[in-house]
């Protein structure tokens, strides 16, 4: 219970500190950012919580550990399927009502998963839990773009994302502890109950506003005619794939390449979790001075260098810890600026664009894990997973550079007379 209080205090502090960089935030706006941060914390717990309870889940339900691992994939499938469906068929409702519906799905999905006693029911529970994930980030970003003054939205979105980073740092260890001491069901029961509290915060703190930019179903797809959103989708997918090609194998890498003991992995995972928190915080802090494009492109470049160092210097314990920290910090430093770039390039279909970003993110996780696994299938050492990881992150950076070139060319082709006079 004490750890749960610490977690809630951490979310409140981070959301307030990062969100306050959005400038001109009154108490009401800070409560909106906090409410959305609580929502992303619940999503982070649900998405990654199964990783710490696989053994207990398999033994309790009577399935194999690989079959229990399928629950991670079912959640990702729910994200991929649910995000566009919700985005396309929610235009008649206010953004607040959409958020309430999404959090209600989180409650239902995690409650189903908690009470399941068969593989089929577990899978359905995970699918339902994943359905609202992408749309929540999209709707949350749109809400913030409407109540925060232009140029400060990136910091506000980073405040929203801070909940996800706290889930990685503190929430998942709490879930693992509950599973080991009591039952894995306690972990997901806690997530379901927590999301009821999130619903209350959305109801009382989020204003009832509409996305007036929505048109008919066909008009929501018009933004996809431009190469700009596709380049951002590519940057999102390749950027996440790059980090996950290495991070998916972080435990054997640290044990067999860097020489850490298995007992040290708890400290290492908390260290990289701290990197995620600080990376997201730094991204929000500098958003007032640099454009989202510059932040994202430079971050991808730093990740490429860090991954190359993990390949060449993995045998040095201190070095491997430093660059593991940098990689995971970079992963969440990318989140807010890429979300803003998608909103800027999805006029008329903002929710669909933001949902597409979450699809790209989850596809990146799958692509990255597969590419890293290929190195192991070839019989290479664990440090070789950092090579395809660096290549994928370089592809992400290249996509952003191509996007920047396209936008500059587009601006150059715009007639000067088209600019407003005065």
Where are these regions (language model features)?
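Helix-breaking motifs and short loop linkers at transmembrane-helix boundaries and internal kinks
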Residues: 62, 94, 115-121, 259, ...
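Cytoplasmic helix-loop-helix junction between adjacent transmembrane helices
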Residues: 125-163
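Helix-loop-helix hairpin linking two adjacent transmembrane segments in secondary transporters
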Residues: 150-151, 155-204, 249, 253
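A late C-terminal transmembrane helix in Major Facilitator Superfamily
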Residues: 345-381, 389
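C-terminal transmembrane helical hairpin of 12-TM major facilitator-type secondary transporters
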Residues: 294-338
